[in-house]
Amino acid sequence: MAGSRLETVGSIFSRTRDLVRAGVLKEKPLWFDVYDAFPPLREPVFQRPRVRYGKAKAPIQDIWYHEDRIRAKFYSVYGSGQRAFDLFNPNFKSTCQRFVEKYTELQKLGETDEEKLFVETGKALLAEGVILRRVGEARTQHGGSHVSRKSEHLSVRPQTALEENETQKEVPQDQHLEAPADQSKGLLPP
């Protein structure tokens, strides 16, 4: 059972030598006599790597490009956006990539202030039709105001809240009665 032995036990030379002696290998490999005549100074035996505790310090420093700072600021201000990356299209450019290209283009024109350049880049992309939404804007537009719903309920008196709920209940009931008639008309074949 020569194949049942682990490769980590002994060197390739000692394993091959034992297989030749046992008669499993009929012919010696070409390298066997050369290895036997000129053995290496240190026999190549597998040794398990030592287990290291703790975090090893990486000797390689991180590589940061000028664009990376622009991208980091873009994602912190505007987020990742709603549009997914189209990986099937080789000519696809993400909103962030367009922003970085426009930023560097405006920077080459002579603008040096980073904050002003960042704002001008956003305006330039808006002029091209790219809509950028800040991270906090989507939440405030959804609610209709800058006040959160929890603080809204705390400032409203209970009686006015009940009156609003009653008016909201009345309106949907009237709309609900009209909706089935419209739907039934649309479902019937002409």
From Swiss-Prot:
CDD domains found in the cross-reference section: At1g26750
Pfam families: MRP-S23
Protein name: Small ribosomal subunit protein mS23
Native organism: Homo sapiens (Human)
GO cellular component: mitochondrial inner membrane; mitochondrial small ribosomal subunit; mitochondrion; nuclear membrane
Keywords associated with the record: Acetylation, Disease variant, Mitochondrion, Primary mitochondrial disease, Ribonucleoprotein, Ribosomal protein
Major localisation: mitochondrion
Composition bias type Basic and acidic residues, residue spans: 166-179
Subunit structure: Component of the mitochondrial small ribosomal subunit (mt-SSU). Mature mammalian 55S mitochondrial ribosomes consist of a small (28S) and a large (39S) subunit. The 28S small subunit contains a 12S ribosomal RNA (12S mt-rRNA) and 30 different proteins. The 39S large subunit contains a 16S rRNA (16S mt-rRNA), a copy of mitochondrial valine transfer RNA (mt-tRNA(Val)), which plays an integral structural role, and 52 different proteins.
Known disease link: Combined oxidative phosphorylation deficiency 46: An autosomal recessive disorder characterized by childhood-onset mitochondrial respiratory chain complex deficiencies, particularly complexes I and IV, and hepatic disease.
Subcellular location per the Swiss-Prot or TrEMBL entry: Mitochondrion
GO terms (BP aspect): mitochondrial translation
Entries under InterPro entries matching the protein: Ribosomal_mS23_dom, Ribosomal_mS23_met
